[in-house]
C-alpha cells in the first residue's frame, strides 16, 4: 500500500508519466534497490509536500494463469481531507499464449481520477511495448466526464478526426495503430480513431 502524509497527488505528472514509465516507480517497481534514485525522484514529483493533505490506499497485483498470462497491478489512492480525490493507477500486461514465447504482448498503463468537488471523472491509458506477432501495437485513449452544472462526456480512442476541434482539457492522443511494415523501402501502418 501507500501512505503519504502531508503530500498531494500531482495527476498532471502522472498523466504525462503514462508515456515515460512513471508507474514503474509506483506500482511494484522492479529491482527497487538498484532503481532507488529514479524511484525516489519519481515519488517526489508525483507526491509533492502539501501541508494538511494526505494520500493513502492499497495496492494489489493480480496474476491469472499458470504460467502467468495476465498481470494486473492496481493502486486505489484516496487524497484527504476535502476536497476528496480518488486516484486509480493501473498497469496491465497480457502475454499469449505464454510468457516465454508470446505471440500477443499487450502492455497498458492507465490513470483514473475521480474529483468529487469538481464533479469530474477522467481516465487516460496508453499502450507501450505491445505487439501482435511481430507487428507493433500503439495507441492512447482518454475519457472525460462531468456532472452537476456542466455535464459532459467525451471518449476518444486513438484521438479525433483531424478536422475536429478536440474539447479543451484533452491531451494529444496517439492513433490506435498496428505497424505492419517499417522498412526503408516499405512502410505499412493501420490506424484508427
Give short role names for the model-derived ranges.
Residues 1-193:
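Extended assembly/interaction regions that build large supramolecular complexes
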Amino acid at each position: 500500500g501507500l501512505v503519504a502524509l502531508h503530500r498531494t497527488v500531482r495527476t498532471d505528472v502522472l498523466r504525462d508519466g503514462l508515456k515515460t514509465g512513471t508507474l514503474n516507480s509506483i506500482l511494484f517497481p522492479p529491482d527497487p534497490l538498484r532503481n532507488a534514485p529514479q524511484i525516489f525522484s519519481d515519488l517526489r514529483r508525483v507526491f509533492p509536500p502539501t501541508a494538511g493533505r494526505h494520500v493513502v490506499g492499497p495496492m494489489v497485483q493480480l496474476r491469472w494463469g499458470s504460467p502467468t498470462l495476465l498481470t494486473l497491478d492496481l493502486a486505489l489512492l484516496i487524497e484527504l481531507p476535502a476536497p476528496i480525490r480518488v486516484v486509480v493507477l493501473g498497469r496491465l500486461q497480457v502475454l499469449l499464449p505464454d510468457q516465454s514465447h508470446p505471440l500477443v504482448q499487450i502492455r497498458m498503463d492507465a490513470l483514473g481520477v475521480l474529483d468529487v468537488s469538481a464533479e469530474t471523472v477522467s481516465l487516460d491509458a496508453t499502450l507501450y511495448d505491445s505487439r501482435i506477432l511481430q507487428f507493433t501495437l500503439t495507441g492512447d485513449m482518454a475519457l472525460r466526464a462531468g456532472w452537476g452544472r456542466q455535464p459532459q462526456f467525451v471518449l476518444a480512442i486513438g484521438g479525433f478526426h483531424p478536422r475536429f476541434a478536440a474539447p479543451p482539457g484533452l491531451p494529444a492522443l496517439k492513433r490506435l495503430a498496428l505497424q505492419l511494415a517499417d522498412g526503408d523501402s516499405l512502410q505499412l501502418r493501420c490506424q484508427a480513431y
